[in-house]
Amino acid sequence: MKLTFLGANHEVTGSCTMLEAAGQRFLIDYGMEQGKNVYENQPLPVAPGEIDFVLITHAHIDHTGLLPLLAHNGFRGRIYATIPTVELCGIMLRDSAHIQEFEAEWKNRKGKRAGAEPVEPMYTIQDAEAACRLFRGVEYLSLIHISEPTRLLSIS
């Protein structure tokens, strides 16, 4: 078993832990580091397509905010969370994408006058929608059977 702390190891935001065990690789949360340039978030040490699934502890953006970016970059596995967490994530991720798009548009309008290069949003509403389609809601304290021998207890 290998545990790699990828986020929130030097501050509170940006929670992300990668666990490799029983031939599987998964993330526990994939959150946005808040209060800094969004493009400076911790990169993953593996390609998103090499991650089997994601387990979400709760819906806060510092635990879920990079899931649309994960989907945009090729992750196609399942994202497991309790049903209320899935519902909240749908709202929060779409809202975050809207903010990303609005801020990029604003920076581009402002930067155009100064001759700055255009910026792209970190992710779009379409990316948030793609991430939301990967969610699988589970009952609180239910056993999630991923594959043999991987089983997890839902606690979010």
Please place each PLM-identified region on the residue numbering:
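Divalent metal-coordination and catalytic microenvironments
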Residues: 3, 29, 58-59, 89
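Conserved beta-strand hairpin/beta-sheet module of binuclear metal-dependent hydrolase folds
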Residues: 1-49, 53
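Acidic/polar short surface loop at catalytic or gating sites that assists cofactor/ion binding
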Residues: 90-135
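Active-site metal-binding motif and surrounding structural segment of the metallo-beta-lactamase
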Residues: 37-88, 94
